Amino acid sequence: MGVVAKNFPIPDLHRVRRVLLSVSDKTGIVAFAQALQTYNVELISTGGTAKVLMAAGLPVRDVAEVTGFPEIMDGRVKTLHPLIHGALLGVREDPSHAVAMEQYGIHGIDLLVVNLYPFEETVQSGADGQTILENIDIGGPAMIRAAAKNHVYTGVITAVSDYDAVLSELKQHDGCLSFSMRQQLAMRAYAHTAAYDTAIAAWFAKNLKIETPSWQSFSGHLKNVMRYGENPHQKAAFYRNGDKRFGVATAKLLQGKALSYNNMNDTDAAFELVAEFDPQNTAAVALIKHANPCGVAEGQTLKEAYLKALLCDNVSAFGGIIALNQPLDAECAEEVIKIFTEVIIAPDATMEAREIISGKKNLRLLLTGGVPDPRCGGFIAKTLAGGILVQSRDNVVVDDLKLQVVTKRAPSQEEMRDLQFAFRVVKHVKSNAIVYAKNSATVGIGAGQMSRVDSAKIAARKAEESAKRAGLTESLTKGSVVASDAFFPFADGLLAVAEAGATAVIQPGGSMRDEEVIAAADAQGLAMVFTGVRHFRH
């Protein structure tokens, strides 16, 4: 059994008379402390924070003066003292606590202002292990947890963004904090220390190369609340974590309204796909709808790539997402504004392109500052009833694979280029996935079918429809190549793509019936390549 609680009245309003400030981020701390002086509070502070406040002419007592004990061990020990923690934890209405506080000269602290050593920033800076360890805060989290536990009497601020809200509350209640505010601050405080400890544990796990730690936590801070989730009856919000990869989470919204839940999901999928193509070597464009590509292409210019991608399925592209691997230029911008698009995401945009796009007020333009490395590690998490599934990112790139020609006929140089292109794309299509490609562009995409044969037939049918809309006399799949995200379990899927006019196939291989499928390919005169890597996507 845990500790038995004592029940005492909870004050709605509690006056702030004594404040302890100890912050790593000094942003706004002087102005905040000056505002507190309006209420005749006593200011206590530590080390660097005390120096900043004193330099501003504020009356401050150093923690060492309060405790009668100096900072020691390079500042590792300064607030870990009964006169500080007793002041944070003392229950004012408890007679035994009151006696102890009187006996030992402990004066309650009514507001704690702490932000922690910048651990995550230190890790991301590439600092060495010893520097990272020195930036693990000890006294700060201990004080935060103590104050949050005793929020009946003590408010606790852990973020600069809370300064204004607390000052507004003090002004409204003539120097007092309401119980509701103290509860909210306590909740944020525990979330803050939990996230801090999560980051530390994650660093240790990574440093020790432990891929599946015995306890896994995930954390993030609220960036924005969406109007709704996937559907209007669902609630949704976006939380930022420590991942600094270029993408939708770190992008700057240059124009347009805030992104919806579906916008965020689709835009992330689009930019992850287009990142498969090195911007130093080629211009690439991906058109996305419901997190699935409806057109992807490479070109000498973004305009060329966009028009090739649009040809694949210009009907589905309407109202979708456009992702570019190079800065948006005016030539491409003139084309993309011809149809309705929800979001454009790109590393940057020229001033001319921005001017062109600005005429479309409902079009969101996101600039990322760069393109993510498709080989970058990380994890993907999915919640289930009663648990969380975690896996590493699918960061295998076709350039790094040892491709095996398994048919009598080897692909031509042109076919091999298109096969590799198609395999980059199929990795980002929902399974079962089939992609037809020709001239470094998708011409038919079959996604999300329970049968691989159905995916092949759907992709071929859509390619035929696109050809008719474009006024072409034959299907786009004639002379194309095909990528499959997983092996063909039977020869029927391969025969379906051959019937559609494909001349070469790239697939993982590994089926019990590989020999049967290879024989069918040889009989059809197809070239086929095995990658040895599957790209299921659910």
From Swiss-Prot:
It comes from Bartonella henselae (strain ATCC 49882 / DSM 28221 / CCUG 30454 / Houston 1). One of its GO terms (cellular component) is cytosol. Keywords: Hydrolase, Multifunctional enzyme, Purine biosynthesis, Transferase. Pathway: Purine metabolism; IMP biosynthesis via de novo pathway; 5-formamido-1-(5-phospho-D-ribosyl)imidazole-4-carboxamide from 5-amino-1-(5-phospho-D-ribosyl)imidazole-4-carboxamide (10-formyl THF route): step 1/1; Purine metabolism; IMP biosynthesis via de novo pathway; IMP from 5-formamido-1-(5-phospho-D-ribosyl)imidazole-4-carboxamide: step 1/1. The keyword Hydrolase applies. Belongs to the PurH family. The IMP cyclohydrolase activity resides in the N-terminal region. It catalyses: (6R)-10-formyltetrahydrofolate + 5-amino-1-(5-phospho-beta-D-ribosyl)imidazole-4-carboxamide = 5-formamido-1-(5-phospho-D-ribosyl)imidazole-4-carboxamide + (6S)-5,6,7,8-tetrahydrofolate; IMP + H2O = 5-formamido-1-(5-phospho-D-ribosyl)imidazole-4-carboxamide. CDD domains: IMPCH. GO terms for molecular function: IMP cyclohydrolase activity; phosphoribosylaminoimidazolecarboxamide formyltransferase activity. One of its GO terms (biological process) is 'de novo' IMP biosynthetic process. This is Bifunctional purine biosynthesis protein PurH. Residues 8-158 form the MGS-like domain.
